[in-house]
Amino acid sequence: MFNKQSVSLEWAGRTLTIETGQVARQADGAVMVQYGDTIVLATAVFAKEAKPGQDFFPLTVNYQEKYFASGRIPGGFFKREGRPTEKETLTSRLIDRPIRPLFVDGFKHEVQVVVTTLSYDLENDADIIALVGASAALVLSGAPFMGPIGAARVGYKDGQYIINPTIAELEESELDLVVAGTTDAVMMVESQAAELSEDVMLGAVVAGHDAMQPVIDAIIALAEKAAKEPFAYEPPDHSAALKSVIDTVGADLSKAYKITAKGERYAAIGAAKDKAKAALLGTDEAPGVMTPEVFKTVFKEAEASVVRGDILKTGQRIDGRKLDQIRPIVAEAGFLPRTHGSSLFTRGETQAICVATLGTSDDEQYIDGLDGTKKEKFMLHYNFPPYSVGETGRMGGAGRREIGHGKLAWRALKAVLPKHEDFPYTIRMVSEITESNGSSSMATVCGCSLAMMDAGVPLTRPVSGIAMGLILEGSEFAVLSDILGDEDHLGDMDFKVAGTENGVTSLQMDIKVAGITKDIMGKALEQAKGGRMHILGEMGKALTASRGQLSENAPQMEIIKVPTDKIRDVIGSGGKVIRGIVDETGAKVNIDDDGTVQISAMDRKSIDAAIKMIKGITAEAEVGEIYEGKVVSMKDFGIFVNFFGPKDGLVHVSQMANKRIGHPKEMVKEGDKVWVKLMGFDERGKVRLSMKVVDQETGKELAEEAGDDASED
């Protein structure tokens, strides 16, 4: 019934198996990939005809994690998987980015790749084999995909690279880098690092590319056994149409792309487009030399050809800058008066308002995944409204792009955050992109770094970021610093680098063409370093380090420790004691299982009051010490006094006074304040108190002899 085919190899100490022919046989391509006990199912399906009028490549990648993969049941009312999690969205993007450029130019048939995690061993993350599976499924499907690609994760510890580190090894690693590529080219890099040098980062990319080669060979071997016949697709030849457009408006486009202001430039490009349409499309009565669909495609190609050629010939950019020149920067801290920390970061026509908000442990984000529920103390949310590019559009929840850009900035800043024990606040960053013309994610890095310093978050060092680009034609190339949006679209590489003066904290690279060598990547990294240092200098005009104190608008906080055996005393039966502390002081109190108590309030007085009450509860009463207490109940044989936090003790009637009394009510009533001395504990551990040895006016101890004589009456 099944025609199973598989390949296996030992890869970084574990067995990788890719199998096809048993599951999802109606998909054009389907593989099961296993690494350790982590298993994914990857499928690829493509439409055999393009939709009429389709003018872009409709590739969709969906990565999904099933809770059953790790033996868990989803939370919530419906108890089933819901909208994509951040992890699923980021992994979908991770798969999309290296495979998209490898489809044949002009292919506009709908393609859908679905990768599902079916088993998760809590050691091997599924994202790497998800990439491998997507690549294998596409190769087997017969789609015009110029793969396969491989992928690998690289860690770094004690000066050594670690290929495909486990989850536990990643926690100790200074680097988490994912690289994907073909046999001879790197296509995508995504990373988070602990201020590592450019050489170490480049070495990690090379190490990962070398490590994935056996996987690429395995996919090719499987394809030789099980691949479908290649889909008959002939890329359209638009060379004559392209030449017609360039001959007609090439000079106009070259002139338009030298205009610095984005709005004026787009107006000039629009005029050139209208001129070309009039000359080449003709009318209904007299058709022109090409169809509107072909014109739309080749006009974009003409733009790219003109811009790329001008940059390589003249060494000058679209807006007149030199290759390594950064746009003018204006950085301002404390931009908004009532926020905890804020900044306005403007670089050319890209601008971000970044805001820091500090909260308590109550504000931590709970993240539910295959490995359980985790709490995150640092959040960064990136918003890209349509007005930032002068357009109208849908306003709603964060899309894939916004989630991806936010996570890139999150990775860039994570390395410089203070340890939680030194700064126990939950931090939420928000970046509102108010203008965009390239590199808004790196503006977010710079702006959020300033906003956190403005809020008083003690970052180890400021972080800046820069987006690099590349124009590559044969052996000629130009590396561009601080690229514009147009340079991103028309270029061959989008290379984002963020870091401090000490090293790189995040690196993201997307390459659209083969042929980018290690030397070119090295030059781009080195040029990016110079740009980052320049940007740090401009940021330093606003703030060079965190402010010495927190914003007056932020909550104040203090952490204390209590013995673990005292936690139940602080909480009380049904939370009665801790609620009483909160109600009486106005402070928020959170206590962890290890005895860490987080106390926060808007004023210091409330915090001090809460600390005093907690210490009163957890401190140990000492025999022989004198305490002030309150009468809480009266019996015939004596009174019970609350004298040390929640502690009550008995003052026997014989210990109330240096004279004989018949009933406690002759001396006190409930609610009276009295002074007592802790005499000790009885055989059952009950507290024994005495009033008669203490002067009830002053709280001073009376002479022992007087007390002893009176007790013998």
Curated annotation (Swiss-Prot):
What cofactor does this protein call for?
Mg(2+)
- Which residues does the annotation say bind Mg(2+)? D488, D494
The answer to whether UniProt assigns keyword Iron to this entry is no
Q: Where is the KH domain?
A: 555-614
Task: Report the top EC class in one word.
Answer: transferase
The UniProt entry, under SUPFAM superfamilies, shows: Eukaryotic type KH-domain (KH-domain type I), Nucleic acid-binding proteins, Ribonuclease PH domain 2-like, Ribosomal protein S5 domain 2-like
Write one Pfam family the protein is assigned to.
Answer: KH_1
Residues spanning the membrane: none
* Enzyme Commission number(s) from the entry: 2.7.7.8
What residues does the S1 motif domain cover? 624-692
Q: Which reaction does it catalyse?
A: RNA(n+1) + phosphate = RNA(n) + a ribonucleoside 5'-diphosphate
Compartment(s) where it occurs, according to its Swiss-Prot or TrEMBL record: Cytoplasm
Under the heading CDD domains, the entry gives: KH-I_PNPase, RNase_PH_PNPase_1, RNase_PH_PNPase_2, S1_PNPase
Keywords for this entry?
Cytoplasm, Magnesium, Metal-binding, Nucleotidyltransferase, RNA-binding, Transferase
Q: Which NCBIfam families match?
A: polynuc_phos (TIGR03591), PRK11824.1 (NF008805)
Describe the task this protein carries out: Involved in mRNA degradation. Catalyzes the phosphorolysis of single-stranded polyribonucleotides processively in the 3'- to 5'-direction.
- Which named protein is this? Polyribonucleotide nucleotidyltransferase
Species per Swiss-Prot/TrEMBL record: Hyphomonas neptunium (strain ATCC 15444)
